[in-house]
């Protein structure tokens, strides 16, 4: 098949586990339990199967989403939810209204090496990242691990075309 024009240069940006931020959110949950207090109205408390990841936009302008590159090294499922939070967790807690829809869900079945995903939602979410990159240097994600996988089993990145 003939090429439609010059090949676009691609830029792959990894989602990186933010261990400090994840730990800080876990300490918030523990602190509330120890003091017998309730969360703020609308606050999102991190669950044991969730971790915070970040994407540092190496380049902010002229990016067009191409695809997600998500690999699980064993069967299981991950849900990647973006946040509108510009994080200063020592000053502000994550609120449920800051979780972006739709989430991207990726899974690997027991009898397969191939990854499956909710294609329409993952594509829509990815396209939003191109817009968010224009106004952000960092994007935070809440990743929920299910069906026996954990952060050590995940490699995830977003691939953009450079315009």
Swiss-Prot record:
Biological processes annotated in GO: neurogenesis; sensory perception of smell; signal transduction
A UniProt-annotated Pfam family: Olfactory_mark
Main location: cytoplasm
Subcellular location: Cytoplasm
Tissue expression from the record: Uniquely associated with mature olfactory receptor neurons.
Signal sequence range: none
N-acetylalanine: residues carrying this PTM: 2
GO terms for cellular component: axon; cytoplasm; cytosol; neuronal cell body; nucleus
Keywords: Acetylation, Cytoplasm, Olfaction, Sensory transduction
The keyword Cytoplasm is assigned to this record: yes
SUPFAM superfamilies to which the protein is assigned, alphabetical: Olfactory marker protein (SSF63697)
Highest taxon above the source species: Eukaryota
Function: May act as a modulator of the olfactory signal-transduction cascade.
UniProt record similarity statement: Belongs to the olfactory marker protein family.
Quaternary structure annotation from Swiss-Prot or TrEMBL: Interacts with BEX1 and BEX2.
Name of the molecule in the record: Olfactory marker protein
Lineage of the organism: Eukaryota, Metazoa, Chordata, Craniata, Vertebrata
Gene: Omp
């Amino acid at each position: 098949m003939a090429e439609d024009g010059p090949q676009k240069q691609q830029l792959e940006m990894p989602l990186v586990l933010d261990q400090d931020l994840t730990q800080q959110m876990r300490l918030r949950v523990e602190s509330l339990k120890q003091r017998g207090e309730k969360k703020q109205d609308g606050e999102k408390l991190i669950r044991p199967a969730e971790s915070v990841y970040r994407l540092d936009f190496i380049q902010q302008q002229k990016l067009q989403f191409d695809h997600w590159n998500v690999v699980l090294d064993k069967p299981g499922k991950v849900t990647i939810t973006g946040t509108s939070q510009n994080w200063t967790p020592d000053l502000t807690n994550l609120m449920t209204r800051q979780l972006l829809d739709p989430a991207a869900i990726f899974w690997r079945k027991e009898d397969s090496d191939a990854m499956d995903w909710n294609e329409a939602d993952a594509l829509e979410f990815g396209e939003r990242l191109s817009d968010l990159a224009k106004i952000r240097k960092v994007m935070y994600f809440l990743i929920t691990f299910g069906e026996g996988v954990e952060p050590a089993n995940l490699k995830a990145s977003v691939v953009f075309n450079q315009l």
